[in-house]
Amino acid sequence: MKMLDLQQELRENAYPGRGIVIGKSEDGTKAAAAYFIMGRSENSRNRIFATEGEGIRTQAFDESKLTDPSLIIYAPVRVIGNRTIVTNGDQTDTVYEGIEKGLTFEQALRSREFEPDGPNYTPRISGIMQVENGTYHYAMSILKSNNANPDTCCRYTFTYENPVPGEGHFIHTYMHDGDPLPSFEGEPKLVKIPNDMEAFAADLWDSLNEDNKVSLFVRYIDIKTGKYETKIINKNQ
């Protein structure tokens, strides 16, 4: 698979929706994750990321403008033991609770499907990272309608064992802007993961469409120690 320029991918797409990037730093020492949200409506743009425990939660920036909290207020990132869960909806909790019960990432997501926001039927995208005893692997998932047919849910899971240093994968909800919004197609895209978390976060944020970008979360986890650094950027301040 050809490696794509992540910044160029974002600059050329005004509305990829929500996106997850997971991979390994070039020097092989860090497990990396990024999650961004975008919005076209006032309700969707009226959000920030706020720290909650070891993860984050979306919150309304201006509570008086919040018209519908369903599908937009949730915990995108949660940590359970040596696993970090990143998703674009409340399926974060589904995966967390599934792991508590002994289910795998894929098994936990069997109880969920795409969002009920027809005619878009926004895909549920999810990722999980496991850092244990100096080893690291990750998986990504997308649950989507069958070409906007809500009678069928298509389930895809991609697992990456012993990822290559400097490589990561990018999955997002929409191919591009549209009405209705077309769901992501194909495998997660191969992208480069640099060593510098701050620079990575800045490049991602600068590349997202100025009108539509809302918030960005980036985390680098030391594969040997499990310690992590986090960067959160909110357009609303």
Where are these regions (language model features)?
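Conserved short alpha-helical segments that host acidic/polar catalytic motifs at enzyme active sites
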Residues: 1-237
